[in-house]
């Protein structure tokens, strides 16, 4: 379209091949990159000013507190953000999501009006206008309320839900509060049930919905509410395309453990475990799965002996509230195993006594019949 302008067409025709490549390929590519970078800078600056910080990326995957619960922090584009301050959260998030598009528009205006470009060459003017135009278009596009192909919300969709304060906004706020509680080591049983209710009220199979259902599953399973835990886990597994990569394998892991521990079904446990990508499980996750499968196979003493390896793997993690919570949950699991082992032992003894009694009764009847 721009090459249809007479002055620009004449300038391109008279330019050298290298200048033409720069004008037609390099400049648009740099404009796209600059538009993306400016929006990220806008998000970061707004987040830092509003009490958020960029969360560490999962370089040491088995040591990050988020990794222990496969619970990624809030992401804006590729940036993970977190905050300890939960006050005025909706207002602060609104400004953060608005920061990126506003930064792009402000940069375009600044670039256009920082000086009089009319005295520059036509090719220079083209470069300036191209960069400014791409920033404006990218900012306007990000304000469109749409959901991406991986069920991620655009800045515009986030702004709409936060300004309307609808069920999806309530879900986002509840999700962030539960994530913060996990990282601070607050036991899921102590969470406000209203958080879980708001987090699971709107299951639109988006990324937010899947993460919320996962957190609700943790809450329900720690409360031994097996009915609710089953529902939350099944709903989370029903939307694999919206599930973050790390969480998808963790859901398969939990499905395997659920079948082994609560259903005593080793066959289904192995089926779910087979879906986990090779090498994705870290040490403490693999040991937890091994214990659960051994239990389902009836090898309760072998499962109990593996507990020491599980505790050792947890102690290898850096000290943090999240590690302390994981160790507390593991200790509770140990007590549950001991209790269920006693139940199994009493059940076995009762069955044996019933068999002995039945055999004795049958022998008495045979003797009476013979007499």
For each feature predicted by the language model, list its residue ranges.
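Small-residue-rich helix-interface/hinge motifs
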Residues: 27-87
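Topogenic membrane-insertion module of multi-pass membrane proteins
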Residues: 1-35
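Charged, amphipathic alpha-helical linkers/stalks
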Residues: 158-210, 214
């Amino acid at each position: 379209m721009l090459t249809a302008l007479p002055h620009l067409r004449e300038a391109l025709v008279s330019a050298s091949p290298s200048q033409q490549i720069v004008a037609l390929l390099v400049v648009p590519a740099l404009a796209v990159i600059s538009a993306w970078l400016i929006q990220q800078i806008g998000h970061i600056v707004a987040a830092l000013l509003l009490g958020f910080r960029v969360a560490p990326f999962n370089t040491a995957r088995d040591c990050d507190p988020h990794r222990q619960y496969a619970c990624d922090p809030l992401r804006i584009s590729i940036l993970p953000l977190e905050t300890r301050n939960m006050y005025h959260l909706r207002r602060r998030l609104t400004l953060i999501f608005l920061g990126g598009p506003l930064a792009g528009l402000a940069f375009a205006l600044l670039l256009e009006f920082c000086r009089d470009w009319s005295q520059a060459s036509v090719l220079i003017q083209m470069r300036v206008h191209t960069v400014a135009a791409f920033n404006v278009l990218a900012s306007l596009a990000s304000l469109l309320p749409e959901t991406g192909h991986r069920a991620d919300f655009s800045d515009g969709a986030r702004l709409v839900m936060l300004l309307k304060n609808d069920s999806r906004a309530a879900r986002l706020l509840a999700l962030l509060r539960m994530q913060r509680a996990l990282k601070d080591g607050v036991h899921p049983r102590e969470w406000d049930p209203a958080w879980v209710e708001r987090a699971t009220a709107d299951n639109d199979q988006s990324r937010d919905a899947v993460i919320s259902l996962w957190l609700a599953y943790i809450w329900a399973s720690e409360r031994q509410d097996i009915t609710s835990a089953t529902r939350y886990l099944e709903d989370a597994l029903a939307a694999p395309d919206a599930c973050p990569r790390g969480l998808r394998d963790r859901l398969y892991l939990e499905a395997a453990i659920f079948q082994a521990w609560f259903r005593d079904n080793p066959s289904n446990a192995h089926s779910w475990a087979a879906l986990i990508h090779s090498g994705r499980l870290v040490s403490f996750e693999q040991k937890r799965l091994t214990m659960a499968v051994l239990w389902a196979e009836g090898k309760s003493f072998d499962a109990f002996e593996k507990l020491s390896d599980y505790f050792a793997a947890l102690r290898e993690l850096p000290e943090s509230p999240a590690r302390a919570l994981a160790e507390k949950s593991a200790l509770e699991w140990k007590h549950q195993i001991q209790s269920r082992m006693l139940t199994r032992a009493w059940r076995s003894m009762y069955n044996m006594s019933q068999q002995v009694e039945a055999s004795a009764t049958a022998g008495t009847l045979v003797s009476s019949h013979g007499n």
